[in-house]
Amino acid sequence: MSCSSSNPSESFLPQDIQDKIHNHPCYSEGAHHHYARIHVAVAPACNIQCNYCNRKYDCSNESRPGVTSERLSPEEAAKKVMFVGGEVKRLSVLGIAGPGDALANPKKTFETFRLVRERASDLKLCLSTNGLELPKFVDEMTKYNIDHVTVTINTVDETGEIGSKIYPWIFYNNKRIYGKEASKILLQRQLEGMKMCVEKGILIKANSVLIPGINDKHLVEVSKKLKEIGVFLHNIMPIISEPEHGTAFGLGGVPSATDQQQMEAQEACGMDMKLMQHCRQCRADAVGLIGEDRGQEFSKNVFNSMSFDELENHYNIKARQESQAKIEEFRFFLDKANERVKKEKAELSSTSETILVAVTSAGQGMIKQHFGTVKEFLIYEAGDLGIRFIHHRKLDVEYCAGPDGANPIEPILAKLKDCKLILTAKIGECPQNDLAGAGLISDQSYANMPIETSVLSATRKYFNISEVYEMNSLPSAEMSRLLQFL
C-alpha cells in the first residue's frame, strides 16, 4: 500500500510532503481521523502578552489553548510520552504548545525533545510558537529532526496598528516593548523565522485567531503573505472570548467569533492558501485523537514512579508498528470505499447550489456516533458533484446529558440552523421529530459507513438529484474488508 495521501485535497502535493504529513493529525485532514497526538506542558513562560490569552496551570474544566492541569519537567514529560505511547498505540506526534511559548522556554523544550528522541524514535516532533524567538532556534530544531512548526500570526500590518490592538507588549532583548513598535518587531521576527524554516524544509502551519472587528477583514492579507513565503497550511481559529476565561478581550466585551464568521474567513482565505479546517484549539496537555480529550487519564501519579527502562518496555515500538500497520490497512480500504468521492470535480455542484450536512462521528472517518452523545458535529458542504469538509461545531452539552435530565435541543438547532441534513449512527424519535420541525432531515441508515461517500449519497438521495447511488453500489470487496475493522 502506498503512503500517499487518501485525502483528495492533499493528493496534489509532492510525494515527500505527503509522506511527512501522512500520519500527522494536525497537518493532514485525513490523518486526524486515525492518529493521535500528545501535548506536554513543559513551557510555562511566555514572551508576549495577547489580549485573547489567559494561561492557567491547574485548570481541568476549560478546553482552549494556554490551559493545563499540571506542568511537567522534561523528564516527567518524556515519561508521560512513553507511557501514553504504550497505551495509545495510534499516537504519532509529540507537540510542545505551552501553556506559554515553546521557544520562550528553550532549555525545557529541547531537553524534552532530546529525551523523547532517544527513546521513542518513531514519533514526529513538533512545536508551537508565537515566532518572536523562532529565528534564533531554527538550527537547533533541525538537530532533533523537528520538521513541523506552528506559528501564531494574527496580522501582517507593517504599521503595527492592528497588532497593537492584539498585543499589549512583547519581551525582547531583555526589555519590555509596547504598542506599535512591539507589533512591528514581532511581525519582522515571525516572517524571518518562517522563511528560515521553509529554507530548511520544515513545514509551517500558521495559526491566525479570528477576532471580530479587529483582524477579521485583514486575514485575507495574512493568507496572501503566508503563501508568498511558502507556508504550508493556514488555520483560521475563531477567538474564544468568554468573560469567565479572564482574557482582556473577554472582559472587555470583544465577542467570540461565530461559526458563520469563521466560514466566511475560510472562504476568503482559501482562495490563496491551503487551509486547516479540522482544528479543535487544543489544550497544552491534550492527549488522543483531535476532538478527543483523554488528558485526565494520564496525570503524573500514573507514570512517574516507573523507570525509563520500564517505560521503554511499556512503549514497545514493535507493538506500536503492528498496530499502526492495521490503521494503514483500514485507511486503504476506507479510501477504496470512498473512491467515487475522491474523483470529485473541482466544482461541488453543476448548478452552483450546495447544502450543509452535519455528521456525528467518533473517528476513523465513519458515521459511528449516537446523536444523543455527540459533543461536536462535523460540517460538510455538498452538491451533486462532490463534497468538502468545512469545520466542526462544538456543543456545550450533550443531548442526553442536559441539566436536570433535560434534553437540550434548542442549542443544537441553533448550531445547525444553516444545515439541511444530519447523518448519524442512531437517533431517538423525539429529537428526530424536533429536528424535522426545524426543517432538518435526519438519517441513521448510514450507520458505520464511510463519511464522505455517505454525505454525497444522502445529498443526492434527498435533494432530487438524478444520479443517486446507494451504499450497496460501493465496491463490495472493499466494504466487506472495511467493516471487518469495526
Residue ranges and their predicted role:
Residues 1-41, 55-69, 83, 87-90, ...:
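N-terminal [4Fe-4S]-dependent radical SAM core
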Residues 2-5, 43-58, 277-289, 433:
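Local cysteine-cluster metal-coordination motifs and their immediate loop/turn environment
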Residues 76-97, 312-323:
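Short Fe-S-cluster ligation motifs
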Residues 103-237, 242:
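Conserved AdoMet/S-adenosylmethionine-binding subsite of the radical SAM
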Residues 257-338:
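C-terminal accessory regions of radical SAM enzymes
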Residues 328-407, 411-414, 418, 443-486:
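Non-catalytic interface/targeting segments
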Residues 412-441:
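Mid-chain, well-packed structural core segment of small domains
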